[in-house]
């Protein structure tokens, strides 16, 4: 379950207006079939108290929040892929409100691979997100809802970080952010990221493979030349 909304309930919003009225100390109310009664222990009320019950409070905008969040990616440990896992360190800045309970996700350009619940306070917050997934071209970013950090970091290869990686099996880690499955556009983005990752991080391997392909074609043409007279020699 992922909570993304406001932490101030309608009751707290109503209580926030109590400074606009005069308050009195009374006992616990006694509710009868037709009356709501209580006693004034201080005897400061000379007349009576009028209680007005209405539905004029607007509860339509309770899901909206004035909180503003800015995200930046600090560091990453671990490896991409589904075996080792990674730990993404995010710096989250909260403004416009004093506290905010929400979720921060670790995503690349295609999809998200982990999420954690964060109780943010005003100012800078350091959040650690443990996730699994991605590929060599994944640049993991810190995201909140649809907003992500401007830069992403690339994790190490699984065979290089097998020992120091985050091979987590704890129940308090969230590896699913509740997003729908990866669709057609998502797979195109993943394929593009993977190709760019291969070209950027392993360009020497690609160059060697291309050179071996050209050398194999040349050796094949030299060692196994085409025989145009084969049909004439075996003509019945």
Curated annotation (Swiss-Prot):
Lumenal compartment residues: 1-202
Chain positions covered by the region annotation Binding to the ribonucleoprotein: 219-231, 219-236
GO biological process: one example: fusion of virus membrane with host endosome membrane
Glycosylation sites: 25
Keywords associated with the record: Disulfide bond, Fusion of virus membrane with host endosomal membrane, Fusion of virus membrane with host membrane, Glycoprotein, Host endoplasmic reticulum, Host Golgi apparatus, Host membrane, Host-virus interaction, Membrane, Phosphoprotein, Repeat, Transmembrane, Transmembrane helix, Viral attachment to host cell, Viral penetration into host cytoplasm, Virion, Virus entry into host cell
Record-stated family: Belongs to the hantavirus envelope glycoprotein family.
Protein name (Swiss-Prot/TrEMBL): Envelope glycoprotein
Lineage: Viruses, Riboviria, Orthornavirae, Negarnaviricota, Polyploviricotina
Gene encoding the protein: GP
